[in-house]
Amino acid sequence: MAEQKRRWGDRRDATLLRDVDSLHFIMGIIYPNRADNEAYIAERVNLEPIKDYIATKNYEGIPFKYTFFHVILTALVKTVILRPKLNRFYANENYYQRNKVTAGFVIKKEFADGSEEAMALLEIKPESTIETIHEEIHQEVAACREQKKVNTTDNSMNVLNSLPRFLSKAAVRFIRWLDKHGWCPDFLIGKDPNYSSVFISNLGSIHLKSRYHHLTNWGTSSLFCIIGEKKWTPLYDEHGLVEMQETVDLGLTVDERIADGYYYAKSVRLFKYLLEHPTLLERPLSEEVEYE
């Protein structure tokens, strides 16, 4: 998205939508909390096209393998780029268009009970492709697990946790007030995925079947995507015969205030089309796609 001159009422990360219809103006006032306005979309995706695609991408034995997560994340952020209302949010009872497209997720340093987690936030460019996103995820994961990268958001939480409880509670209340007005500095929220366009979690990687995650009133994220566990499902083939194919359930939790049902339905159709045709993700993400 092109840089615009900042005006009174704009945030550092978003532009205030001034010319809006009465419904969207009123909704932020009478329904001020994001977590009270969740809508849930459940979709089952056939993984066979994605399996063929990542097998081709991994054919030459690259060290950091392409996975379903890379394809799903890239398809989702391309959907957000092509369907810009998905990149909106309400904050402090106002309606905003985010200036950038970002994707947030949590990295588990080790698959062990006592293992720490770190937060990652990717900035997605219009010219990005699945290859560039794959490499950025590789860098984030490697830096996190090798503990070479200082995450200012994680560090800020550690500082607050080290304070006496009454001081940390007072500090957090002040930070929440800053958050409400869009004044939180980057050293506090720079890598917080709750400020992303898309917050995505691969629960299937830890063998959880859950397809729902709540939105939060902290931050600005209006779209949460859960990737479930892969499973074999009986599906009809092109000849009308039933065969077992691998599928995954995706759960999308969205803020119903930012767009209407028709807009969401059309966006989901685009998202699923991209997952059925993953080679399209090798093109710049801003490139339009004929899907209807």
Predicted feature descriptions by range:
Residues M1-E292:
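C-terminal catalytic/motor cores of large multi-domain enzyme assemblies
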